[in-house]
Swiss-Prot record:
Residues 598-608 have a biased composition (Acidic residues). It comes from the Viruses. The modification Phosphoserine is found at residues 90, 106. InterPro entries: Helicase_SF3_DNA-vir, P-loop_NTPase, PPV_DNA_helicase_E1_C, PPV_DNA_helicase_E1_N, PPV_E1_DBD, PPV_E1_DBD_sf, Rep_E1_papillomaV, Znf_lg_T-Ag_D1_dom_sf. The keyword tRNA-binding does not apply. This is Replication protein E1. ATP-dependent DNA 3'-5' helicase required for initiation of viral DNA replication. It forms a complex with the viral E2 protein. The E1-E2 complex binds to the replication origin which contains binding sites for both proteins. During the initial step, a dimer of E1 interacts with a dimer of protein E2 leading to a complex that binds the viral origin of replication with high specificity. Then, a second dimer of E1 displaces the E2 dimer in an ATP-dependent manner to form the E1 tetramer. Residues 598-626 are annotated as: Disordered. The lineage of its organism: Viruses, Monodnaviria, Shotokuvirae, Cossaviricota, Papovaviricetes.
Amino acid sequence: MADKSGRLLGGCSFVLDEADCSDLEIDSDDESDKENVPNGQDMCNSFDAEFIDNAPLAQGNTLALFQSQVAQAGKQKVNYLKRKLHLESSELGTVGRAVLQPVNHSTPAAKRRLFECSSSENEVSYAASPAAANTQVFRNQNSGSVGGSSGFGSQASVSQSQQNSNLHLQILKSKNSAACKLAVFKFVYAASFCDLTRPFKNDKTTNYQWVAAVFGVSEELFEASKQLLGRSCTYLHATCRAHEKGSVALLLLSFHVAKSRETVTNLLKNLLNLRAEHMMLQPPKLRGVTSAMFWYKMTLSPNTYTWGQLPRWIEQQILITENSSEVLKFDFSHMVQWALDNEMMDESSIAFHYAQMADHDSNARAWLGLSNQAKIVKDVCTMVHHYQRAIMRSMTMSAYVHKMCERVNVTGSWLVIMQFLKFHGIEPIRFVNALRPWLQGVPKKNCLAFIGPPDTGKSLFTNSLMSFLKGKVLNFANSASHFWLAPLTEAKVALIDDATHACLKYCDTYLRNFFDGYSVCIDRKHKNAVQIKAPPMLLTSNIDIQAEEKYSYLKSRVTCFYFNDKCPLNEDGKPLFQITDPDWKSFFERLWQRLELSDQEEEEEGDENGSRGTFICSTRNSNDFT
């Protein structure tokens, strides 16, 4: 309110605009004083007297409010601890039920409740076993399984068939059946299935040995399957353990032939009358001491049925021998000696065949355990090339031919070669007389040329001789490279097959010294050029060198043989003349003296260094010394 001058009067700001004022409430004794006091100030004093109440107030029920707040805070702390520790629920009060509501996950198909309610129809909880600590496994407590509880109490005994059915339902109803089976297996056998096996992703991959974990198997069918599985296995390991959730069987099968996971699954389905979802099949882990000890200890149990001899991969890892300390030690020289004795010159062949020896060779097993296998194979191949090149250079042509003859164990007929030469009108004695200086590397007699039209057997004849003498074949398509002649540094003989005008022109320009049989210099990739004596060479072509005037410098350096008739074929379309390594062996042994090859017994007596003997490059063990 404001006075006539417009000032606000103190203490009247709380008065409502539409406050009711009654003249009856004013005492008659104050009428005389009211005339001397302004109207606005008198109204404010009246409201101040009625609004302010200085009377004492009652405390109210604050203690009950405090107790309810404390109880609610305690409930929240208990709920937090239960959610954190995954404890089972108990009877909750009315206040707690409003807070502890089901928690919905992002996946609508699988719902999980924080706490159980005893009055609910279907009650779901998590398995509290140690094996399932990391895996969530659902169980239905009203299904009648042992250990399950319901609102009416737990059952004391359940039949085995009902246990197996409950285990099947548990596996089928679980969100992750693989995790459910792994958890049950680990709980029953106290070992992880993944530690005993190695994974195969493809069901079509075949293997001789398989590990099978079967859940909910019937005892009668399991006992009957032992005899049936023994017929198709070299080794059978079968055990079955009963559990409150159902029986779990473990099988180690070693078949006569390799089988896929699909085949083994169908076999067990028919024998045990189970579905594929109730099985786990993987091949065993062959290189693990833990896995081998598990299977060995299981065989000692009276509840385990075994048939056949224990697999070798288990014996090797559990048996202790006097050389057990040397098993893991790899000897590089032994691998080089093996590759040299078996004439392994290719990296892929060395790696593949040496890995196959791991079953009976401790050095091969040690090599497989190394992480730098590829580097070792490359180094072995390099060393074998060095040794073979040095051995070949130290041998004469007579010793080399004799070695090639010893390599062939089968006896052939030298008449096949003679008949082939007669078929083309070549006198055998003329070919033998030309072959003698060719083997000796006589200058101007170092190249034999076989000339004729196509399909006359030129390549058949020359390639069979290269196969017997382990010669090198040069391809003129690589002539653009400076290193296309590098194979001659590791060859005793060489062949240029199907030479055209371009090839003959190149030979006439650059390879005259090669055809002469003199020393030549050959460039090698990433290595220094090497000087060697040109090896004897064979040449096949459809062009008559003697009739071409532009090849006049090659005429005196090449001895020509003409194949004019087409090579006959049999009913199967194969050449009628089949010249093999045994045939060439018989040819050289028959004409050894006529070819003027030296006697090997005399060479061995005159060889003081013993180069003809077996070359030993491996280190000796302490047991080798006497």
